[in-house]
Amino acid sequence: MSSINPSLYNDNGVYCSKVIVTKAIKIRDLDQIPQTVLALAATNNGANYDYASPNYITNARKRFKARLNRNPIWYPKMGDTAAIFFARSDQAGWDIRAEVDEAILYTQKQYPHIDINYAVLTPVNTHDLVDMNLIAQLFAEDDAAAAAAANQPNQPNQGQ
């Protein structure tokens, strides 16, 4: 079914930089699935979250809705078909892969129709989850592109 892309890890088993985050978000454009991306925040802020707990999902919604200041996209809505996972770690040596794996397993169990494309982490010791301004900018670009495409007259398919 779904799996973590091993190319997202560096030699130390730690997820790569924000460049990878950018590419992961842009998968919405590549797959032409705007507004169908689920990003579930698998975070550690000094507390141990039970990833199978509804409270974990609820808290993640509140936290990231406030930070992104846009419609939440990190939990399943009607029509969601794909997932991107974000996580962070404040401690060197924290098993950040297991942190995301737990959330992936929960999502696969609760929402089997969701196709998990990427699991993305910022480097260890990064204070912020990711560059939220960057993410908001990319979402805005995607939304603008989708709006522009919606205003174009339908082009006939050629050779298909």
Swiss-Prot record:
Region annotation 3 X 3 AA tandem repeats of N-Q-[PG]: where it falls in the sequence: 151-159
Ranges for the Sequence repeats: 151-153, 154-156, 157-159
Alphabetically ordered keywords of this record: Developmental protein, Growth regulation, Repeat
GO process annotations (BP): aggregation involved in sorocarp development; positive regulation of gene expression
Coiled-coil boundaries: none
Protein function: Unknown. Its expression during growth is not required for growth but for the proper initiation of development, therefore playing a role in the transition from growth to development.
Protein's name according to its UniProt entry: Vegetative-specific protein V4
Name of encoding gene: lmcB
